[in-house]
């Protein structure tokens, strides 16, 4: 498979790529080959009518679709597509070639119409406001498609009836010639031929318009719903997101919705739907999977009602042909309908269950990918893969059951016309009627005309079932509770903030008890010890609350908010930002607000755009903000200054840079109220002092600033201080007042006083990893885009992918078995109708009527049975292939190096594991099966006609060449359009997913419209390509239908001219078959396009499963490590050199040191010294360039990555929590007892060591019994956002304690906790990790001066390494200078050592 690179469109909303946007994958040569006629296959060159034309240049910009303003003839024949098809045949299509959507189809225009209708329908009390609003919006195009299909369906039925008269004409001529009577005039026969041909032509045009209008409506509905889901996600309340009890209004709406679905709520006040809440994963699934199902169903929706109409008309005509005998066949159809109804209900139920499993898989996949760095640190790849595999196993089994039922319905629906015709003909024969070829084969053609609607009806009903379920889910989401703006605005009040007895609550999942039941059922022996668990389970289920808050803050005041971990500092700011629900009292703000949260949300765009955040660029103000936030030095380092793309989630910049960017965003927003949640925790003291001076007390002077902080040394500069305790305001006052009168404040200050000087003077110039991350970028690149451009194949899906797909299905034997079953089923089917012709002409006089009937019935039954076996075998093999390829792709992705995740948007990966896998599961098998059945039927018909009408072969040759030319002409463009659409769709997913994760920040700043506009532009860009993917199908279909019409005409002429020589029975059989050709050719083209387009999804999954770069093996069988390794934890670095990528400078240079088992090493150093690189090297996130690292004598490069990482533990700076419970986060794979988990929570100070109750804030000196309780089953929401950053860091410490590894790496694990908790954590690390090897990368020198040795890094090398006291004695040493700047004296070091 040759690959080229799609230009990055996620940033520009789909702007054309630059000339230098191709990746180094040989795409230039590939595309040159595609465009070069000499590089094409000989038959492609021979059939190329444009081979002498010049290759057109790539346009500079995209233009509006040629459909806009096209003539009636051009629209009817899709001639407006011809210019693009021509370009696509001459060279691969580029993004600039893809036309934009018609102005009246832009999503903004459609959304406005939709929203007006939705409001109107909702106000009118419609039961299905969403459904009716969609109908109102797209009524004209929707009904036009339905009208076209009604005409088409009627013509499909009337054309076979007209063959009765042509067959009668042939019979008359045949009998007349045999009896010597005058033959009928040939003009009469030719008149029938012309009539049938005209009817076929009109039917073709109508069918293509129906399909085009249906797909167009589906694409437009998809666009509107994506925007609606996004808009709702921006407004969704925390309670609805978490799955909690909704407001009475929302409950009433949900009750109405459930009643319409014949489902009642379990009890009043119960959570919505399946009690899961609308987490990010479910919202993404709505946008990617459910919306796509609605889009798919729109394409052929009208078949659901036109099929019954055509069936009824056909039965009336059958009564005319066969009299009452047709009622026998009709009765069989009637009997079959209840079976179909029951089966559809079963499909509806199964699809709902499958949706839940798919949601689980997609949500877990997204969560794993978001925390992949942490998963790698702990070596959990295999365990998470097993968890995904288990969910996938149940999902595939459910899908296979669903498809088996669909196959049964399909085969029954295919068999019904056969058995109905069989029953009618047998009844007709047994009722003493002569089997005249004219009514018999006209009736056979009528029964055959029923085959397509009956075949498609169950598929369409299945799609409608899926869409109905999806529509209900979206409807349920749209009526979910919205975040109310509880905070009032009063521009005239003197204060900036006025809180009067206000109470707030976080809203989390109400169904935690249900989850707890499931977990306990899975682990019946895992129970909490009675002596440890809290007695009040209701309290443990309570979310954290702020109570009785009364506070007024002036417009120009700087107010600090302090308190212990979990006291409610961050919650107070979140409440003012609108993230918490007001439950009592009132809050009023006088002005606009900006929010700098503790956890920075970074967009996948440039640094400047992240700071501007939708505001207009003001160069002077921007420069002032950059300077005040100490970002100028960083801009000089970045390869393209502030235009540098900083990657998804800000992966290319350090924690300190993220925090400063966060502060800069809040300041640049120029609001009068600025909420700052611990903004100085991730920056060093030097930078923190600069920000305090220049930003908080500089640019923001004169504005209302509320600063939550652990840096208590800044309190003296604040106008007032708010002391939080247990979710309440404990005290408010000036620094002097609180120092004099408040005991809790005094206690906090006394704890902090030991560290305050260090915090003021500590002088690492910026956070340690900043320069190291910059070193990962090519310094000489002038404007490199960080995100890798998505691979895009420029050739058809190659045999490599097909072979991989067949192999993944089980074995290559499957392909042979499927082909054999298909051929056998078609042979039996053709023989069934051929036998009917022998019966009508009494070809075998020796056979009785009963024998004819018996053989005829046996062939019909055999045809249905073999078709069912074929269909079931194929769908089972296909879903097995999907399961295996997903497993390979997911395994490969989790085994990919971190550089892959750093340069690939999460939405792009999620797209492959949601949309593409959904296509492989549900659409690919159907498309391949229907294509295979239809193409073999066409071949069978051609062979049959040639056997009896030899001259047909002469006409077939030029028509076949025309068919082949048109197909080749089409496929070149179709491939490129689909691939462009796939990549543009990935960009929409990425943009949608990114914005959903940043909802809190987007809301706080009030920039929802900006992100909506960005998504809108991406959707329009995607639709520009998507609409063309089916427009070119229709262009081809019209032209191939012209071939089919000519085939009908030629066959009709041959029947007329051979009327004296060929039996009327054979003529009737041939005519009945040839009329099905037009439908079949249309269907073949459509299914071939579906197969190719759906195989594109397989190709993308296959690429992830085979082409991604891999890390070293997880296990090396030839070099296993014993269970007890490492027994001592001795680490040796021997001349270690490391660079992040080839061609980049070394970040570790000839580093050598020996760390004894049980030794505690503190690692410090200036910017870019290489401290974090040591961690990367030890975990082998980046492989060494030279040298080696040994642990207890074992070279870590010679053992498996899992064997290494599973024996290490890390406490990272950015802790990651997964959705579930505290138990599942501490011990996700049930490897430890509950007692061990409780002990870890106690040691990490997440629960009180002295009482039975478990409190979040054990460091709270007053230990209030009303504090939020934790149990092992306490729910952890998505990304753990219901816990403060400090609490998450404590959870990471508890996780490391549970792991009980011999070697622990600590990466500034206490940066977001207060000093009292920090002190207790240091004690825990000293006691809990006693005898363990501990490497600690530290910001606060005070925390490591009691370690055994200090390693001072400088420019990738060890500058100093010795005991703290010995390093202090070196007067010109780096460590000595750092200590002096931090206010650490010799006595401090000696004192700490003596304490030890």
Swiss-Prot record:
Signal peptide: none annotated. Disruption phenotype: Abolishes the production of cichorine. Pfam families: ABC_membrane, ABC_tran. It is found in: Cell membrane. It is a multi-pass membrane protein. Keywords: ATP-binding, Cell membrane, Glycoprotein, Membrane, Nucleotide-binding, Transmembrane, Transmembrane helix, Transport. GO terms for biological process: cichorine biosynthetic process; transmembrane transport. One of its GO terms (cellular component) is membrane. GO terms for molecular function: ABC-type transporter activity; ATP binding; ATP hydrolysis activity; ATPase-coupled transmembrane transporter activity. Residues 510-533 have a biased composition (Basic and acidic residues). Residues 757-771 have a biased composition (Acidic residues). Glycans are attached at residues 321, 604, 880, 1096, 1150, 1154. Residues 18-29 have a biased composition (Low complexity). Residues 1-40, 510-543, 751-787 are annotated as: Disordered. Residues 143-466, 816-1093 form the ABC transmembrane type-1 domain. Residues 525-751, 1131-1380 form the ABC transporter domain. Cichorine and its derivatives are promising in the course of developing novel herbicides. Its main location: membrane. It comes from the Eukaryota. The chain crosses the membrane at residues 142-162, 191-211, 300-320, 324-344, 409-429, 440-460, 816-836, 852-872, 930-947, 951-970, 1036-1056, 1065-1085. ATP binds at residues 563-570, 1165-1172. ABC-type transporter; part of the gene cluster that mediates the biosynthesis of cichorine, a phytotoxin active against knapweed, corn, and soybeans. CicA is probably involved in the secretion of cichorine. Belongs to the ABC transporter superfamily. ABCC family. Conjugate transporter (TC 3.A.1.208) subfamily. This is ABC-type transporter cicA. It comes from Emericella nidulans (strain FGSC A4 / ATCC 38163 / CBS 112.46 / NRRL 194 / M139).
